[in-house]
From Swiss-Prot:
Signal peptide: none annotated. The lineage of its organism: Viruses, Riboviria, Orthornavirae, Duplornaviricota, Resentoviricetes. Homodimer. Homomultimer. Keywords: Capsid protein, Host cytoplasm, Outer capsid protein, Virion. It comes from the Viruses. This is Outer capsid protein P3. The keyword RNA-binding does not apply. Capsid protein which self-assembles to form the inner icosahedral capsid with a T=2 symmetry, and consisting of 60 P3 dimers. The keyword Repeat does not apply. InterPro entries: Inner_layer_core_VP3_Reovir, Innr_layr_core_VP3_Phytoreovir. Pfam families: RDV-p3. Belongs to the phytoreovirus inner capsid protein P3 family. One of its GO terms (molecular function) is structural molecule activity. It is found in: Virion; Host cytoplasm.
C-alpha cells in the first residue's frame, strides 16, 4: 500500500524493504483540435515516486532452534528418605512452568484482577507477541550424521540445545546401561526426516517450475513441547500473506500501468526470470475505505497537503511589459493621464495567475479540502468593471464548492446591488424598496450585513416589462427561473455551516450544475475499473464539443453576461465610466475578445487532473457536512485573472510535471480503518462497548499499541479526532460520529488475515490457562505446612497443604465482600478495635507447628484430621519456588510466607479501588534429592532436623499444592515423549529481494483520449 515496513539487519532477517515504483518519465501525447488548429499537450510525469505498492506489517526474521523460548523447566532429583537409606534412589524428572512469554499474556506480574481489564490487556499483548514470537521463523536445526544400528540417519545435535540436551539429561539415570540405551533412543527419536507436505501455502497461481515442493523441506523431531513451537509455527502464515514470488509482483505492476506505459525491460526480465525460493513483499491490491478521510481533520489535512504537493502547472505566458505596451496603445494612455482602464495595467500579476490556476486545479481535484477567500469583495465591487469582469470569468472556472456558501451569497448580493444601482429604473427600485424586497441603495450597512439572497428575491419580484434586469439575472443563473434558483439542494441541517445550499449559489459557477451533482472527469474510469479501483474522479472543468475540441461555452456564456453588464448601457453610469467610457469600452472589448486565451488554464488543468486522476485524494462529490475549519483556506484576487486573459499563450506545447501517486496517500485511511477494526475487536472480546467499561484514555492506549504494531509507526488516536487541525483538542462527538458510521469497506485482506491470526493466538493462549500460576481463589488458615521426611516421593516438604486437608468453615464471595468485612469495625475496649474479618480469622481452630513436623514416620498428621480455612473467591497469582533438599540440613531455607496481616494490609491499601490488583501468594516446595547422599547420620530423626523443616511451616494465606501444575516423570521415555515436537524447515532459505524498483517506460507515441465525458461508468 503506502507505508514502509521495518527494515532488518544481517543475513538472518527477512528483508522487509518494500517494492517501490521508481522515478520514471513518460510522455503520453494527447492530440486534439482547438478552434480548428492542431494542439499537442505533453505530460511529463514521475510515476509514483517512492510510492509503495507493497508492505509487510509484521516483518519476519529467522532464528535457530536453540533460540526458541522455553516454556518449561526441568528439575532432576534422586528421591531418597530422611528415615532410611535407599539403595537405588528413583531418578525423577520434575517438569514445571517457566516464567516466560505466557506470563505477559496472563498478566502475571501486574495489572488488575478485574476480568475485562485482563481481557483488554491480553488483546494488547497478543499483537506484541506477533512481533516477538510469531514473526520469528525457525530456520535452522543443528543436525549431524549418525547411525541407528547399520542404518545411517541425520540426528539432531542435542549438545547445542542447552538445557534441552536430552543426552545430558539421560546421564542422570542411575545405571550406565540405562544411560546408553536412552541416548541411543534419542538418536532414533530426534531425527531429520522427509517433509510430508509444504508448510507454506502461498496460494498464488504460479508456473510449476517456481512452485514450492515438499522435497525442498525436511521435518525435524526436536526436544521441545509442541506448545513451545506453536507460536513460531504461525510464521509460515505470516510469510505467505506478506510475501510472494516476483512473478506475482510483475503481473501486478504490469496490470496497473496505463496503456501508454509498460515496465522497463530489465525490471521485467529480473522479475519473470526469478527462480524457485525467491520472494518479494506482496503487493496490496485491496481497496481502502476512502471516505474515512472525511471523518478526521488530521487525515483530511494530510491528504490536502499531499494534493498541493502534486499540483504542478506550467503556463506559457507573454512578457508583462509586452502586454502592458500593447494594451497601453488600446486605451491611449499618455504620460500624464490616468483613468480606470490605464490604472489596471499596473496590476498585471504573473504570480497571481499561477496562484489562481493552482487554486482552480486543487478545487477540481477535490472539492472538500480547501476553499477560497475572495479579496476585494466590497459592496460596490461590480462598479469596477475590471474586478467585475474577472470575477465573472473566475466563476466560470471554479466549481461552487471552491468558495464558502457565505462568499457565494455575498457575490450574489454584490451583483444585486450593482444591478439596482446601475441598471434598475427609479420606479423599479422604489417598488422593490416599498415591498421590502431590497434595502434602499444608501442603506450600506443593511446591504453588507444581509444574510438572505437578495438577487433571488429581486428575480422573483420583477414585472414582465422589466426585461433588462430579468435578462441579466436569468443569464447569471444560466437560464434557471426564479423558482428554480430558490430551490434548496442541501438543507441547512445537513451542512456544517448551517446554511441552505440553493441552486442560486451553484448556478453561476462552472456549468451551472448543482453543488451536489458536480460532473466527474471520467477519462480514466475504465482504467480504474480494470484495477478494481473506485470511480473517484476529479471534477470536470470543461466539456468537449466534438473531435476532442475543448469547449469554451462557459467562457462564452460569461463574456455575454459581462458585455450586457458593462457595454449595453446603464440607467445610472458607475463613477468609473464618467468621462472614461471610450477607454473603458476599448479595454473591456479587448478583454472579452481575449478570453479564449484562458484555454491555456483549461489545458493545464486537464493535463494535471489526468495525471492525478487515480490518486485517492481525487473526488467529485461535495460533502457539506465537513466543517469549514477543517479545510485549508487561500486568499484569491479575481483581478489576477486579468493577466491570464491577456498574457497566457494557448495552443502551445505545455509541459506538465504532475506526479500520479496511484495508491499512495492512503496511510491515514488505513490507520483509521485499523483503529475501527481494533475497537470492534475489543468490543467482541469484552462483549460490550469498551467505553462503557473503561475511560477512553485506557481504550486509546490499547488501540494505539496494536495499530502501531501493524503500521510500524507510533500513532496517536486523539490527533485524528479533534475539532480542527488548529485546535488540537480531542473531540468526543467526532469520535462518536466515527463509531456510528457503518463500515463501508472491509480491511485489506492482508490486515484481516493478520487480525484473524491474532485471534487464533488469543484463543490458543486462553486454552493454556491451566499451566499459568493464577488461581480463582485462595485460603486463609491459622497455620499451615507440609512435611513428609520419610517419603521416597518427589515432594518432601511444602509451605502449603493439599486441598483435601482443608475444612472450609467460611466463604468470602469476592473482593467487595472481603472489603466490607474489613470495614465492619467494632470497639473491643477503650483503646482498640476489631473488625468482622479479623473475628472470622480469630475464630478458626489453630494447629501447632509441631503437628506439621514432629509426627509419626515423618509425615504431617493433624490431631483433628483437617485444617479450618476461610475460602476467598478472589483471583490470585502464586509465586512458585523449588528448594532441592539433599539432606545437609545445615542452614534452614528462606521460605517466603504470606500472613493474615499481609492480607489486611492489602485490603487497606486498595479499599477504595474499584478494580483490585492480583494478590501474590508464595509457594515453596522442597524436592526430595536425598538420594544424592550416602550419609546415615543425616537420615536420623533428630530435633535439629525437625527444627530445619519448621521453616516450611507458618503461612496463613495459601494456595493448595495440588493447584500447582507440575508433571513428574520417573521414566526417561515419558520425559522424551513430553518433549517431542516437529518443525518443518526449508533446506535452502528463501532469497528475499530487497528494494526492487519498478520503472515504467512509454510505449511510443500513444494517443490518450481527451474526452472527459466519453468514458462514464455505467449507472
Amino acid at each position: 500500500m503506502d507505508s514502509t515496513g521495518r527494515a532488518y539487519d544481517g543475513a538472518s532477517e527477512f528483508k522487509s524493504v518494500l517494492v517501490t515504483e521508481g522515478t520514471s518519465h513518460y510522455t503520453p501525447v494527447e492530440v486534439y483540435n482547438i478552434l480548428d488548429e492542431l494542439k499537442t499537450i505533453k505530460i511529463t510525469s514521475t510515476i509514483a515516486e517512492q510510492s509503495v505498492v507493497s508492505r509487510t506489517p509484521i516483518p519476519l526474521s529467522k532464528i535457530g532452534l536453540q533460540d526458541v523460548k522455553k516454556l518449561f523447566d526441568i528439575n532432576v532429583i534422586k528421591c531418597g528418605s530422611s528415615l532410611r537409606i535407599v539403595d537405588e534412589p528413583q531418578v525423577t524428572f520434575i517438569v514445571s512452568y517457566a516464567k516466560d512469554i505466557y506470563d505477559k499474556f496472563m498478566c502475571i506480574e501486574h495489572d488488575s484482577a478485574y476480568e475485562p481489564s485482563l481481557t483488554m490487556h491480553r488483546v494488547r499483548v497478543i499483537y506484541s507477541m506477533l512481533n516477538d514470537y510469531c514473526a520469528k521463523m525457525i530456520s535452522e536445526v543443528p543436525y549431524e550424521s549418525s547411525f541407528v544400528g547399520e542404518l545411517p540417519v541425520k540426528s539432531v545435535t542435542l549438545n547445542k540445545l542447552g538445557d534441552r540436551n536430552m543426552d545430558a539429561l539421560a546421564e542422570h539415570l542411575l545405571f550406565e546401561h540405562d544411560v546408553v540405551n536412552a541416548q541411543r533412543e534419542n538418536r532414533i527419536f530426534y531425527q531429520r526426516k522427509s517433509a510430508p507436505a509444504v508448510p507454506v501455502i502461498f496460494g498464488d497461481d504460479l508456473e510449476p517450475a517456481v512452485r514450492e515442493r515438499a522435497n525442498l523441506y525436511h521435518r525435524y523431531s526436536v526436544p521441545y513441547h509442541q506448545i513451545e513451537l506453536a507460536l513460531h509455527a504461525l510464521a509460515n502464515d505470516l510469510l505467505s500473506i506478506q510475501y510472494c514470488h516476483p512473478t506475482v509482483v510483475y503481473n501486478y505492476l504490469s496490470s496497473r500501468a496505463p496503456n501508454f506505459l509498460r515496465l522497463d525491460d530489465q525490471v521485467s526480465l529480473k522479475l519473470t526470470s526469478a527462480g524457485i525460493g525467491t520472494l518479494m513483499p506482496r503487493p496490496v491490491v485491496q481497496l481502502l475505505d476512502y471516505d474515512l478521510v472525511y471523518m478526521s481533520p488530521l487525515a483530511l489535512n494530510n491528504l490536502a497537503s499531499r494534493l498541493l504537493r502534486k499540483i504542478s502547472l506550467h503556463l506559457v505566458m507573454q512578457m508583462v511589459t509586452a502586454v502592458q505596451q500593447d494594451l497601453g496603445e488600446v486605451v491611449s494612455v499618455s504620460s500624464n493621464v490616468t483613468n480606470p482602464a490605464s490604472a489596471c495595467l499596473v496590476r498585471m500579476n504573473v504570480q497571481g495567475v499561477q496562484t489562481l490556476a493552482v487554486f482552480i486545479a486543487q478545487s477540481m481535484l477535490n472539492p472538500n479540502i480547501s476553499y477560497g477567500m475572495i479579496s476585494g469583495l466590497t459592496l460596490d465591487c461590480f462598479s469596477n468593471f475590471i474586478y467585475g469582469a474577472c470575477l465573472m470569468l473566475f466563476q466560470a472556472l471554479i466549481p461552487p464548492s471552491a468558495l464558502t456558501a457565505r462568499q457565494r451569497l455575498d457575490i450574489n448580493n454584490r451583483f444585486a446591488y450593482f444591478l439596482i444601482k446601475c441598471h434598475a429604473t427609479q420606479a423599479t427600485t422604489a417598488r422593490l424598496v416599498a415591498n421590502q424586497v431590497i434595502y434602499p441603495v444608501d442603506a450600506i450597512d443593511q446591504w453588507q450585513s444581509n444574510g438572505r439572497d437578495v438577487l433571488v428575491a429581486i428575480y422573483n419580484n420583477l414585472l414582465p416589462g422589466e426585461l433588462v434586469l430579468t435578462n441579466l439575472i436569468q443569464t447569471y443563473f444560466r437560464g434557471n427561473t426564479a423558482q428554480q434558483a430558490a430551490e434548496i439542494l442541501i438543507p441547512a441541517d445537513q451542512t456544517s455551516y448551517g446554511a441552505n445550499e440553493t441552486r442560486a449559489l451553484s448556478a453561476p459557477y462552472l456549468f451551472g450544475a448543482p453543488i451536489n451533482m458536480l460532473a466527474p472527469d471520467a477519462r480514466l474510469s475504465t482504467y480504474k475499473r480494470d484495477l478494481a479501483l473506485p470511480d473517484r474522479s476529479p471534477i470536470l472543468i470543461t466539456t468537449v464539443e466534438g473531435q476532442n475540441s475543448i469547449s469554451i461555452e462557459n467562457l462564452r456564456h460569461k463574456t455575454g453576461l459581462i458585455r450586457a453588464m458593462y457595454l449595453n448601457g446603464f440607467v445610472t453610469q458607475p463613477p468609473a465610466w464618467i468621462r472614461n467610457a471610450n477607454s473603458n469600452t476599448a479595454l473591456l472589448s479587448r478583454f472579452l475578445d481575449a478570453t479564449p486565451n484562458l484555454l491555456g488554464i483549461y489545458e493545464a488543468i486537464l493535463a494535471n487532473t489526468y495525471a492525478n486522476a487515480v490518486n485517492v485524494y481525487c473526488d467529485s462529490v461535495y460533502r457539506a457536512d465537513i466543517p469549514i475549519e477543517w479545510k485549508l483556506h487561500q486568499s484569491v484576487d479575481p483581478q489576477d485573472l486579468l493577466f491570464g486573459v491577456f498574457g497566457i499563450v494557448p495552443q502551445y506545447q505545455i509541459l506538465n510535471e504532475a506526479v500520479p501517486d496511484f495508491f499512495a496517500g492512503g496511510e491515514d485511511i488505513l490507520i483509521l480503518q485499523l483503529i475501527r477494526a481494533v475497537y470492534d475487536t475489543l468490543s467482541n472480546k469484552l462483549g460490550r462497548n469498551p467505553a462503557d467499561i473503561f475511560h477512553l484514555e485506557e481504550v486509546f492506549k490499547v488501540i494505539e499499541e496494536i495499530v502501531s504494531v501493524l503500521v510500524q509507526q507510533k500513532i496517536d488516536v486523539r490527533k485524528y479526532f479533534t475539532e480542527s487541525m488548529r485546535s488540537g483538542s480531542f473531540s468526543k462527538p467526532r469520535w462518536d460520529n466515527f463509531l456510528r458510521r457503518p463500515v463501508a469497506q472491509r480491511l485489506p485482506n492482508l490486515y484481516s488475515v493478520i487480525m484473524t491470526q491474532a485471534d487464533h493466538v488469543y484463543n490458543y493462549m486462553t486454552q493454556l490457562t491451566h499451566i499459568i500460576p493464577i488461581t480463582d481463589c485462595f485460603y486463609i488458615v491459622k497455620n499451615s505446612g507440609f512435611v513428609d521426611r520419610g517419603s521416597t516421593g518427589p515432594v518432601i516438604a511444602s509451605s502449603s497443604v493439599y486441598e483435601n486437608v482443608l475444612k472450609v468453615v467460611h466463604t468470602i464471595a469476592d473482593f467487595d465482600a472481603a472489603n466490607a468485612l474489613r470495614l465492619q469495625r467494632r470497639r473491643v475496649d477503650n483503646t482498640s478495635y476489631t473488625d468482622s474479618l479479623s473475628d472470622m480469622f480469630n475464630g478458626l481452630r489453630s494447629i501447632s507447628s509441631s503437628e506439621f513436623v514432629r509426627s509419626v514416620n515423618g509425615r504431617s498428621v493433624f490431631t483433628e484430621g483437617r485444617i479450618d480455612a476461610i475460602k476467598v473467591n478472589m483471583r490470585a497469582k502464586f509465586d512458585l519456588q523449588f528448594i532441592t533438599e539433599e539432606g545437609g540440613y545445615s542452614k534452614p531455607p528462606n521460605v517466603k510466607k504470606l500472613m493474615f496481616s499481609d492480607f489486611l494490609s492489602f485490603l487497606d491499601s486498595h479499599k477504595s479501588d474499584y478494580r483490585p490488583p492480583l494478590l501474590t501468594v508464595p509457594i515453596t516446595i522442597g524436592l526430595n534429592n536425598l538420594g544424592e547422599t550416602n550419609s546415615n547420620t543425616l537420615r536420623m530423626r533428630s530435633e535439629a532436623i525437625d527444627e530445619y523443616f519448621s521453616s516450611y511451616v507458618g503461612a496463613q494465606i495459601l494456595v493448595p499444592i495440588n493447584v500447582v501444575d507440575t508433571r513428574v516423570y520417573t521414566e526417561f521415555s515419558e520425559l522424551r515423549n513430553f518433549f517431542t515436537g516437529d518443525v518443518v524447515i526449508r533446506d535452502d532459505p528463501f532469497d528475499v529481494w530487497d528494494g526492487v524498483k519498478a520503472t515504467y517506460i512509454p510505449i511510443g507515441v500513444h494517443g490518450v483520449r481527451l474526452d472527459p465525458n466519453g468514458d462514464q461508468p455505467p449507472l
